[in-house]
Amino acid sequence: MNPWRGLGVLPREVWYVCLAILVNRAGTMVLPFLTLYLTIDRRLSVSFAGITLTVYGIGSILIAPLAGRLSDRLGALRIMKISLFVSGLLLFIYPFANNLASILTITAAWAIASEAFRPPSMSMIGDLAGAMHRKAAFALCRLAINVGMSIGPVVGGFLAMRSFKLLFYFDGSTTLLAALLLVALPWRIKSDAGSGPQNGESQIGLHAAKKSSALYSDVLKNRRFLYFLLAMIPVELVFFQPIAAMPLFLVRDLHFTEAGYGVLFAVNTVIIILVEVPLNMSMSSWSHRHALALGAALVGIGFGALVFVNGVVGAVATIVIWTFGEMILLPASAAYVSDVAPPEQSGAYMGLYTMGFSLAFAIGPWLGMQVMEALGPSAVWLGTFACGCITAIMMWLLPKRSNAVQQLEQNG
């Protein structure tokens, strides 16, 4: 049986979104190398690098719920185009920031523009795929992300050895190219009345306009969803160490080169490219509770094992472990949110879900680097192990579906 065959049932609009994500991520190199850019090229302190990443995270927090609401009101596709165009332009401007205040300002603006893409893209994928195919759709989305990420950081590592400014120009160019793809692709969906195809953006926008204008206070009444968001926070803090404590540990303490770090970063993405979709297709019958608990546990074990690492082989082994956790946890968590969200509030639910990652981005990199400076890298990796275990236990205790949610999932 071909485990990839299930992707063939996904609507072509899902593939369009994933294509734009692929192009954008193929140039993603500024964020993975931002800590090294600030500390090596700009000769700024580790503390300021942590503050800069925190500012990015705060921008992400501010935009996530707003982007979700705008997606429900104005249409996901429109918000995605604006996000890519603005963030691409800001990347070209970033290298010209010549003082601390301007670096923080443009970082905040870039974060808001860039992170506005995620809630509408995830909401759109979940809506178009339907309940039966959401795990496959989100696995395809992550496949696109990681095919791109297998290119961006590797190329970025070699560009950084020549000039860090090249990272910004390359990243900005692919971001603008992704925006142009969203404009150029034929977004056409058959009308319900059978009157032939209609313009996809207007139909998607019309569908969004018909959605309820329920406030976030309605979403916050869903206690099961709030428990899930709370459970995700510890492991979300861990996921941002590869752009904070991990590059400092590998380059400064283990003496990897920037190019070596980029290649090592690609180990994660290559595994995901080869394994994630078949893995999630084979686990499609697993309950959310079991998949989420296993994924979080593997993430904690993988990062925690860095405490024993002193060379390339050990680093690769730990990446393999936490990558399997990532491949299980992230598609399952996105599918869970799509399943529990009422159709008219999918953007709002996804906005709060992505806001959790944004909160972790604001805290995790800064916290990881502060702990590393004060207590050493071993304390960071033991802390990541504890965070993974906390999320795993909480997910194992995740309240079961209500009958209403089960009926909603069955109806797609």
Predicted regions and their residues:
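Juxtamembrane intracellular "pre-TM" segments in multi-pass secondary transporters
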Residues: 1-11, 189-230, 412
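Helix-loop boundary and gating motifs at the non-cytosolic
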Residues: 7-57, 226-231, 236-264
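Residue-level signature of mid-helix packing/kink "hotspots" within the transmembrane helices
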Residues: 29, 57-65, 149-150, 269-277, ...
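Helix-to-loop junctions at the C-terminal end of transmembrane segments
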Residues: 63-75, 275-288
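Cytoplasmic helix-loop-helix junction between adjacent transmembrane helices
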Residues: 107-147
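Symmetry-related core transmembrane helices of the 12-TM Major Facilitator Superfamily/SLC fold
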Residues: 167-184, 381-397
